[in-house]
Amino acid sequence: MGQEQGTPWIQSTGHISTQKEEDGQKIPKLEHRNSTQLMGHYQKTMNQVAMPKQIVY
């Protein structure tokens, strides 16, 4: 019984760790793109909030 309970746990953990490694390799690229887009979006939003009179036509 102990081995039967242990084996699926080991397999599932190995599967999860494999997914984490794959995600870890992809995350830096996504973070870099998102941070660049977020900064651009953040600056636009800040400009709208900081200078509403200039944006109102």
UniProtKB/Swiss-Prot annotation:
Top-rank lineage group of the source organism: Viruses
Compositional bias annotation for Polar residues: 1-17
GO cellular component: host cell cytosol; host cell nucleus; membrane
Localization per Swiss-Prot or TrEMBL: Host nucleus; Host cytoplasm, Host cytosol
Region described as Disordered: 1-35
Key words, A-Z: Host cytoplasm, Host nucleus
Main location: host cell
Membrane-spanning intervals of the chain: none
Residue ranges, compositional bias (Basic and acidic residues): 18-34
GO biological process, alphabetically ordered: symbiont-mediated suppression of host cytoplasmic pattern recognition receptor signaling pathway via inhibition of MAVS activity
InterPro entries: Flu_proapoptotic_PB1-F2
Similarity comment text for this entry: Belongs to the influenza viruses PB1-F2 family.
Function: May play an important role in promoting lung pathology in both primary viral infection and secondary bacterial infection.
Additional detail: Is not encoded in all strains, and seems to be dispensable for replication.
Protein name, UniProt field: Protein PB1-F2
Organism listed in the record: Influenza A virus (strain A/China:Nanchang/11/1996 H1N1)
Taxonomic lineage: Viruses, Riboviria, Orthornavirae, Negarnaviricota, Polyploviricotina
Gene name of this polypeptide: PB1
